[in-house]
């Protein structure tokens, strides 16, 4: 992994060049529209691009029609995500006819697919700039080229080990944010496209992560979410390896930081050291997202998850013994190729035994480019729908039961924003439970004690306790 400070200087210089160019080109501040699709790591990169463009002198608008630059950060986990982007481009074509000066920028995971690039080049020639995940750090330079060029620029790298630090970012919240600690994935689950578009795992140096978080805390951040496709394998690729548990301890030592969250954790790599660290920590939130995907050992093997039903259940028991009040959430796929009723019953059995606080349930979606897409024995749609409905009913029942344990208790809430209903504010407990309560604007970004009065399943209505 190459933490390239020289490249950082180069890109910051291109930001300055773009700023001067924008001043020359526009009489008043130009506008940009940006839209994110996909995971929280994508969201962080969208924040970075928004921060860069704002630093160049652009102001953000909420409609493509009002923008001088339209930017899409794309996701390709499901093929439907690709279709949505093509739909957006059809809409943008008519906008660009009315405003030929409009710049259209596409980046992210979808752009790493050769067939996508070919299609954009042939059918969407009005798109101005296209780049991928491996040269994301080159955005200021590429955008400068685009501002000086009439034609289409496509610059997609197959791989890169560079991590560029110190770029501007535009955070949604001033008091909490995500921090990427690593990039890429080495797991190659048979249904997942991510390793092919994000590349192999590369970890940031712990010193760079700590420096970034200290800067965020100095800027008012009190809660961070440490992000990676599999945070449990953090540090293995570094010249001087560091475990994720060791990194957590370093982050915990940062004065002024109150809460630490992280995701995603692959069950095969969740160590006893990490469980101990969670149990002993005063800042790591007692919420763990532990994707199960299936409760069937047979299906898990075909998925290439590298654990089985028994190991997953043992892991959950170990976690609950160490952290009894843990809030446990998961991901579950229904209808994976070859899934039988017995396999599905194994999944229901795990849900029964694990008492998840909530679960993200998905119907299997065939993703071209993955081994699973070529598998035979695709499960009929009506069977999948029936299983999905049965699973969802159980997940909701167990979730309501798990959440109800907090009813009548007083919890510390980080207040995030005012809801659509005036005077009602929302925040989260350390268990990642959403709470609505009457309050005022001054509470946003603060930690307050709230009595959880009424459980509504996966969220609560409460009242200030002080």
Indicate where each model-derived feature is located.
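Short, solvent-exposed loop/turn segments at secondary-structure boundaries
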Residues: 81-83, 200-207, 235-241, 302-305, ...
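Proteins enriched for Cys/Gly/acidic motifs involved in redox and nucleic-acid/cofactor modification
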Residues: 1-227, 232-234, 273, 288, ...
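Conserved, mostly hydrophobic/aromatic
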Residues: 189, 209, 226, 262, ...
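Terminal RNA-binding accessory module
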Residues: 374-466
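Radical SAM enzyme [4Fe-4S]-AdoMet core and its adjacent flexible, acidic
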Residues: 39, 235-252, 256, 303-306, ...
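Generic beta-strand/beta-sheet core signal
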Residues: 35, 194, 227-229, 263-265, ...
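Short flexible coil/turn linkers enriched for glycine and charged/polar residues
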Residues: 172-175, 185-187, 284, 294, ...
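Conserved SAM/AdoMet-binding glycine-rich loop
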Residues: 103-106, 113-115, 218-341, 352
């Amino acid at each position: 992994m190459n933490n390239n400070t020289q490249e950082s200087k180069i890109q910051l210089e291109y930001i300055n060049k773009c700023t001067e160019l924008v001043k020359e080109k526009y009489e008043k501040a130009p506008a940009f529209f940006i839209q994110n699709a996909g995971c929280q790591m994508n969201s962080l990169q969208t924040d970075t691009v928004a921060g860069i463009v704002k630093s160049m002198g652009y102001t953000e608008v909420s409609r493509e029609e009002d923008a001088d630059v339209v930017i899409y950060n794309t996701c390709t986990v499901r093929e439907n995500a690709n279709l949505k982007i093509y739909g957006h481009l059809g809409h943008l074509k008519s906008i660009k006819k009315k405003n030929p000066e409009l710049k259209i920028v596409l980046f992210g995971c979808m752009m790493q697919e050769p067939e996508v690039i070919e299609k954009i080049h042939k059918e969407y020639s009005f798109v101005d700039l296209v780049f991928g995940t491996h040269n994301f750090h080159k955005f200021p330079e590429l955008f400068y080229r685009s501002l000086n060029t009439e034609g289409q620029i496509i610059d997609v790298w197959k791989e890169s080990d560079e991590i560029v630090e110190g770029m501007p970012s535009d955070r949604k919240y001033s008091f909490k944010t995500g921090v990427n600690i690593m990039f890429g994935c080495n797991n190659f689950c048979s249904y997942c496209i991510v390793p092919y578009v994000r590349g192999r795992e590369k970890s940031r140096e712990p010193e760079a992560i700590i420096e970034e978080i200290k800067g965020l805390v100095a800027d008012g951040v009190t809660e961070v979410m440490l992000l990676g496709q599999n945070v449990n394998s953090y540090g293995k690729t570094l010249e001087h390896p560091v475990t994720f548990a060791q990194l957590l301890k370093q982050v915990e030592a940062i004065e002024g930081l109150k809460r630490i969250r992280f995701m995603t954790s692959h069950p095969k790599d969740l160590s006893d050291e990490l469980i101990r660290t969670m149990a002993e920590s005063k800042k790591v939130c007692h919420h763990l997202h532990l994707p199960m995907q299936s409760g069937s050992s047979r299906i898990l093997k075909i998925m290439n998850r590298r654990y089985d039903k028994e190991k997953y259940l043992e892991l959950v028991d170990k976690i609950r013994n160490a952290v009894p009040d843990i809030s446990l959430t998961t991901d579950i796929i229904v209808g994976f190729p070859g899934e039988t009723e017995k396999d599905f019953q194994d999944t229901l059995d795990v849900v029964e035994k694990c008492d998840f606080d909530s679960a993200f349930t998905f119907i299997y979606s065939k993703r071209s480019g993955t081994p699973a897409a070529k598998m035979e024995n695709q499960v009929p749609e009506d069977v999948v729908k029936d299983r999905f409905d049965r699973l969802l009913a159980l997940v909701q029942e167990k979730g309501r039961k798990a959440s109800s344990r907090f009813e009548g208790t007083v919890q510390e809430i980080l207040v995030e924003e005012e809801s659509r209903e005036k005077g009602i504010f929302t925040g989260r407990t350390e268990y990642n439970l959403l709470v609505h309560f009457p309050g005022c604007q001054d509470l946003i970004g603060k930690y307050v004690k709230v009595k959880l009065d009424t459980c509504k399943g996966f969220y609560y209505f409460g009242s200030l306790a002080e």
